Curated annotation (Swiss-Prot):
It is found in: Nucleus. This is Mediator of RNA polymerase II transcription subunit 16. Keywords: Jasmonic acid signaling pathway, Nucleus, Transcription, Transcription regulation. One of its GO terms (biological process) is auxin-activated signaling pathway. Residues 547-557 have a biased composition (Basic and acidic residues). Component of the Mediator complex, a coactivator involved in the regulated transcription of nearly all RNA polymerase II-dependent genes. Mediator functions as a bridge to convey information from gene-specific regulatory proteins to the basal RNA polymerase II transcription machinery. The Mediator complex, having a compact conformation in its free form, is recruited to promoters by direct interactions with regulatory proteins and serves for the assembly of a functional preinitiation complex with RNA polymerase II and the general transcription factors. The keyword GTP-binding does not apply. Disruption phenotype: Late flowering in long days. Very low expression of cold-responsive (COR) genes. GO terms for molecular function: transcription coregulator activity. One of its GO terms (cellular component) is nucleus. Residues 841-861 have a biased composition (Polar residues). Residues 1-21, 530-557, 839-861 are annotated as: Disordered. Induction: Not up- or down-regulated by cold. The lineage of its organism: Eukaryota, Viridiplantae, Streptophyta, Embryophyta, Tracheophyta. It comes from Arabidopsis thaliana.
């Protein structure tokens, strides 16, 4: 059942057209990671290198490019000159293990469309075909349906597993991810009644990784044909803005006030457990649920089920249905009886058999009595949930006593009763009603019904099909459809109006005024049938059949639906589907034959409509976590593969003349989606994708969206709120700015990465302390004697985590060392520049060399500094490629040459004499420069000196590091020899495995040796001297830090904090509405304006004793002077340099191709399967920089060789444990988003745990769900 080696292609569609064609494998340099994984029992893994092809098509209204008949009559709903905005299109192929045994019988096997998007994992599950096995094979089941699990952020990561099909005409009827509040699970319901629940492996230790591409079948059952099978979840505590229009007026309110539900909390609640409800076409309902609370991975959870409860919809059953848990915890089912297809009835499902009848369970209860309906064990839960858990508790106790009743017997004992609570009649066209008795079995009726998931059962959406069903004169012709009608109904409780003849109503009803549920139609719109209903053409891949009969006369015959006899619908009763977004803000209506209409808000404002060629099926889309995008899937029979397309919903595609009209409105709407994702806890990649796509189309500005989020962040009412959302906003902005060329923006991204690293390290250290409150809150306000008198035992670390915490100490020291080094170089540069500017006579005013603070809305142009054209909008074309832009007219050539030399000097590793110069000396006309204003925008860490929160947190953690180093001081005598041996071996291995050391490295090592000799003089005792100069830990590229270096780092930060503590640190002002919006940092506690002389005064006394950063490590990579940002979306078109391309078979070799790819670098890799004629087509990698970034992110091929840390998988530093790993032990997992890697987790199916330490297992289990730096999901490295 488990399958390997999916083959996949990615198509990035550019709506603006163009003739560029690029095609080549894009995942060449990931070959070692994307290779074949070892097959695990009952587990599906990510697999082979996957071919990624860039394809360009001018997107037409029909997604598969099939042109519609120009002669067909059009309607106002169909006239849409703007094609849907496509984020990307993916071609999904089955693995070779499937294709080897697949029989090609397209006229026999069914094609369909089933897709679901997981909000937590950002994973898309899709299926589109049923496959048949060749008769000679026994490898697979006779019929199967491949399920593709795709990560849209990195579509090269795709898992494929097979679901058993019962016939070649079987299909996936329902596919749905579990609610975000529940454990991750995928529900797959086949049309013939086979239901499977797929989950990530959970049996194992606490640090078992949650691999986004590893899935196993946890439970399976069979059931009758259903009209709906779905997850049940309690009412969400959140409400989207559309349901509370007045909330958006208060810009100063918190996001909780904007999005939290204003309804009163009910005492009855529905817990977060896996619960599936099925409503059958026969008119009954059944519940399956997983054991809750779960047994924490020790054994597989047990599943239970109830007996079918009869709805009472009549002998013919129901047409369509939906189920929901209301705000009060009750379960409601809305259904459409076949005997009255224009009426919607709402039933309430309650525990027990109903009518006071007592069920007689078939199971042998012995001395035990089945639980009553009001068990005291589950007080506070909704009655139905308490009833299910009471039976669960009882059945588990029976099993423990050795009694094992069959699933059928136990489910027969758990009965449900259903009673109608309300109903309303939907619209039926008078024309169809008048003719129904003579020409049809029944007239127009409801074909789809759905609850709004966020309104607790008080809002129902309805789709009505207007026309005639089966004609008695020619039943084979099928139904004719004259149109669709979409409605939105709201319910409210109103008092019953009684005639006076019945007396006083309050006296007859126990003093209570009788009430009734009243349904009112709020939206009622008509949608004409699409052109394919009027003149249906058989799909190109279908068999050759006779053309539809020419209509004799009139529109009535022309509108008939003519079915291909080999492509009949699964269920003629289901002609449409309704899909709500998770927050209810958007709704999609999918019609038979692939028409999709998307609406927004409670008034169902049209947003988008498009056509999917799925034949006689319904292409129900799936909304992304924030519903910024939608995903549709179909089967391309010509290419024999599934096609997945992601379409931008917010903002929709707009005509060019309208794209700028509502720019600020769209930017505000996108920002709201980001905040919603952070509050609810779902993935925000779709909002990033739609922002970048809309920015490319000119609808929004990337800088403006970030400015809106910054303004929202700074308007939060408290520091606690900003501490909560600050790191997540850093992650979002880093992801939005991915691939930006502007040097000041890239430096800012590195600053945000440094803040994220510090946040991760701080939380890790706090969780490892025996008493986390022992960390000194503001150490710079404490006098020196108090600091010296602090007992290191007060900050004791859990003994089981001592080895892990040492690696965190190393990372903090690395971060501080790089931060201070950049500040020292920058302060020296500012001082030299200011002195030269004064002596050159370029002006005596401070403003000549002072850039504006970050509070200013628009920058002033300096006279002797790089042109402010650097601050162009991200994503806009710019000709400025270096930091040494041309000076203005007042600058002379020798000043410009000097500036270039100064910038080159500061970028070099030799600091020169300026590094150690006293801050007091220098030109008498020294003009200070504000250090955090972007004066030299390309240098990282400069802005961080003005970040109060970063500076104070780093100082706090450095005190902990200093105490940790001091606590190990007395025992250094015993560890000196082993430490020397370790560092000596490291140095030798580095010399052997690395190229010749660079002069800069020699200078650094010489300086460190000289510094050690200086420290040795004047120190009492040889042993103490050796202890002070012995390096400990594996920081600074493995060479460690001496006691004196740790002390110096701590004292420098203390001095900086003291000197800046008295400065004002206001929150930056909003840039929203400004004409020149720049990308800026956001600040939790506000930002200082720190002068370079203050930095020099703090660094001056310690210049000779500061550690010199060396090599590439987890912290150092963040602040290197590389253009480093972790690569993530190599496939995204904004990083693909040539943009769109085409299919291999459609490729035309033109001069344009070579022009597009003339600047691409093709790695020396053998591209098997690519024709020689395409050799001119280069790789998708846009720049050589991306290759070097990836090497640096993995710690390989960097400027300083890492020697001993080079393993079979390359050099890596584990981002979870912060220790260097060789790749020889454990299983490596990488983050989908930033590609950081770790081997700290336990893998599914592992028989031996490498680390039996329970405390350390808990330590790493904090990050089994996602990367601590960027929040991306884990996938296995193969």
């Amino acid at each position: 059942m488990n399958q390997q080696n999916p083959e996949e292609e990615v198509s990035l569609v550019n709506n603006s057209g163009g003739g560029g064609i690029i095609e080549a494998p894009a995942i060449v340099e990931e070959k070692e990671e994307e290779g074949l994984q070892q097959k695990q029992e009952e587990t599906i893994e990510s697999t082979d290198p996957i071919l990624v092809v860039v394809e360009e098509k001018l997107l037409e209204k029909s997604v598969d490019g099939e042109k519609e008949d120009d002669n067909s009559s059009s309607s106002n709903m169909e006239i849409d000159p703007v094609s849907p905005a496509t984020v990307f299109c993916v071609k999904l192929k089955q693995p070779n293990s499937n294709l080897l045994h697949k029989m090609s019988v397209p006229e026999l096997c069914r094609n369909f469309s089933a897709v679901a998007w997981c909000g937590k994992l950002n994973a898309i599950a899709c299926a589109s075909e049923t496959c048949a096995r060749i008769p000679s094979s026994k490898a697979n089941t006779p019929f199967w349906i491949p399920i593709h699990i795709l990560i849209p952020e990195r579509p090269t990561e795709c898992a494929v597993f097979n679901v058993v099909a019962d016939s070649p005409r079987d299909s996936v009827q329902f596919i749905e991810w579990s609610p975000t509040s529940c454990p991750r699970a995928l529900l797959i319901a086949n049309f013939h009644g086979r239901i499977t629940i797929w989950t990530q492996p959970t049996q194992g230790s606490a640090n078992l990784v949650h691999d986004a591409t590893s899935w196993q079948c946890e439970h399976e059952w069979r059931q009758d044909i259903a009209v709906v099978t779905k997850w049940l979840t309690g009412a969400s505590p959140y409400r989207w803005l559309s349901s509370k229009p007045s909330s958006g007026t208060n810009a100063k309110s918190t996001f909780e006030e904007k999005f939290l539900s204003q309804s009163s909390e009910s005492s009855a609640r529905w817990p977060n457990f896996l619960c599936v409800c099925s409503v059958f076409s026969s008119g009954s309902v059944q519940i399956h649920w997983s054991q809750w609370p779960s047994n924490q991975g020790s054994t597989a959870p047990k599943w239970f089920s109830t007996k079918k409860g009869l709805l009472g919809a009549g002998p013919s059953g129901i047409m369509a249905a939906d189920a929901i848990i209301t705000d009060s915890g009750a379960m409601h089912v809305a259904g459409v009886p076949i005997v009255n297809p224009s009426t919607i009835v709402v039933w309430e499902v309650t525990p027990g058999p109903g009518n006071g009848l007592q069920a007689t369970p078939k199971i042998s209860t012995g001395s035990r009595v089945p639980p009553s309906l009001s068990s005291s064990s589950w007080t506070g839960f909704a009655p139905l949930a308490a009833y299910l858990f009471s039976w669960q508790e009882y059945l588990i106790s029976e099993i423990k006593q050795g009694k094992k009743p069959s699933d059928q017997d136990s489910s027969d004992a758990i009965s449900l009763s259903c009673s109608p609570v309300s109903n309303f009649s939907a619209y039926v066209s008078p024309e169809a009603a008048a003719q129904s008795a003579a020409t049809t079995t029944w007239g127009s009726g409801v074909t789809a019904v759905a609850f709004d998931p966020t309104r607790g059962g008080s809002v129902i959406a309805v789709v009505i099909v207007e026309g005639q069903y089966m004609s008695p004169y020619d039943p084979d012709e099928g139904p004719s459809i004259t149109g669709w009608r979409v409605q939105r109904w709201e319910s409210s409780v109103q008092p019953v109006v009684l005639h006076q003849i019945f007396g006083n109503p309050t006296s007859n009803f126990g003093g209570q005024v009788p009430t009734q549920t009243v349904w009112v139609s709020r939206v009622d719109m008509s949608i004409p049938p699409t052109k394919d209903f009027k003149n249906h053409q058989v799909a190109a891949a279908g068999p050759s059949v006779d053309a539809p009969k020419e209509p004799d006369s009139g529109d009535e015959k022309a509108n008939k639906v003519v079915f291909d006899p080999f492509d009949l619908p699964s269920d003629i009763r289901t002609l449409a589907r309704i899909v709500y977004s998770a927050h209810g803000g958007e709704i999609a209506i999918a019609f038979l034959r692939g028409g999709v209409h998307i609406f927004s808000g409670p008034t169902f404002s049209p947003v988008e409509n498009y056509q999917i060629n799925v034949g006689s099926a319904i292409a129900a889309p799936a909304f992304s976590p924030t519903s910024c995008c939608s995903a549709s899937v179909w089967h391309d029979a010509a290419k024999d593969c599934a096609m997945l397309k992601i379409i931008r919903v917010l903002p929709p595609a707009l005509p060019r003349n309208q794209s700028k009209v509502d720019q600020s409105t769209w930017e505000r709407a996108i920002a709201e989606r980001f905040w919603w994702s952070l509050l609810v806890g779902v993935d925000w990649w779709d909002a990033v994708g739609c922002t970048q796509s809309a920015a490319e189309d000119g609808i929004v500005s990337l800088n403006s969206v970030i400015a809106v989020m910054d303004a929202d962040f700074h308007s939060l009412p408290s520091t606690q709120h900003r501490q909560q959302y600050g790191p997540n906003l850093d992650r979002i902005k880093c992801r939005l700015l991915e691939g930006t060329n502007a040097q000041e923006v890239r430096a800012m991204v590195l600053d945000m990465q440094a803040r994220l690293l510090l946040d991760m390290l701080g939380k890790g250290i706090e969780s490892a302390l025996v008493n986390p409150s022992a960390l000194v809150f503001e150490p710079w306000r404490v006098d020196g004697e108090t600091i010296t008198g602090i007992n290191p035992e007060a900050m004791a670390v859990d003994p089981a985590l001592v080895s892990s915490i040492q690696a965190y100490v190393d990372a903090v020291l690395d971060l501080a060392s790089h931060f201070i080094t950049r500040l020292r170089r920058y302060a020296s540069f500012c001082r030299t520049l200011a002195s030269h500017a004064a002596s050159a006579g370029t002006g005596s005013n401070r403003n000549n060399v002072t850039s504006p603070t970050q509070n200013a809305s628009s920058p002033a142009t300096p006279q002797v500094f790089p042109d402010k054209s650097l601050y162009l909008a991200v994503g806009q074309p710019t000709t400025t490629t270096t930091t040494t832009a041309t000076t203005n007219s007042s600058g002379s050539s020798h000043v410009q040459a000097w500036m270039q030399g100064a910038i080159a000097k500061i970028s070099s590793s030799n600091d020169g004499s300026n590094s150690t110069a006293s801050p007091i000396s220098g030109s008498p006309t020294f003009m200070p420069i504000s250090i955090n204003t972007g004066t030299f925008p390309g240098t990282p860490a400069v802005r961080l000196i003005g970040d109060c929160h970063f500076l104070h947190r780093l100082c706090q953690l450095l005190l902990f590091c200093f105490l940790q180093r001091s606590s190990r001081f007395p025992q250094r005598n015993a560890d000196v020899s082993s430490q020397k041996l370790q560092t000596g071996a490291t140095s030798k291995l580095e010399e052997v495995n690395s190229a010749k050391p660079t002069p800069a490295l020699n200078r650094i090592e010489d300086a460190q040796g000289f510094r050690g000799a200086q420290l040795g003089t004047g120190v009492k005792g040889i042993d103490e001297n050796s202890a002070r100069t012995t390096k400990m830990g594996s920081g600074n590229a493995g060479q460690g830090y001496t006691y004196e270096e740790v002390r110096v780092l701590f004292h420098i930060l203390m001095d900086l904090c003291k000197r800046t503590s008295g400065l004002a640190h206001p929150l930056p002002g909003s840039q929203v509405g400004s004409g020149n919006i720049q990308v800026r940092l956001h600040y939790i506690d506000g930002n200082y304006t720190v002068l370079p002389e203050v930095v020099e005064a703090a660094l001056g006394p310690h210049m000779q004793n500061m550690p010199r950063p060396r090599g590439a490590d987890a912290a150092g990579l963040l602040l290197r002077e590389l253009e480093l940002h972790p690569p993530s979306e190599e496939w995204h078109r904004r990083n693909l340099f040539g943009g769109p391309g085409s299919e291999p078979e459609d490729m035309i070799l033109t001069d344009d191709v070579s022009k597009l790819s003339n600047s691409l670098d093709l790695p020396d890799t053998n591209f098997s399967g690519i024709c020689d004629g395409y050799n001119r087509v280069h790789s998708l990698w846009p720049r050589k920089r991306r290759m070097s970034e990836r090497d640096a992110a993995f710690g390989s091929n960097t400027s300083v060789g890492l020697g001993a840390y080079l393993g079979i998988m390359g050099s890596r530093r584990d981002v979870v444990t912060a220790t260097w790993k060789t790749g020889l032990e454990g299983v490596w997992y990488k983050c989908i988003r930033c590609l950081r890697q770790t081997s700290a987790f336990a893998s599914p199916g592992a028989t031996k745990q490498p680390n039996p330490n329970e405390r350390e297992t808990w330590w790493t289990s904090r990050w089994v769900y996602c990367c601590p730096m960027c929040g991306g999901t884990w996938v296995r490295v193969v």
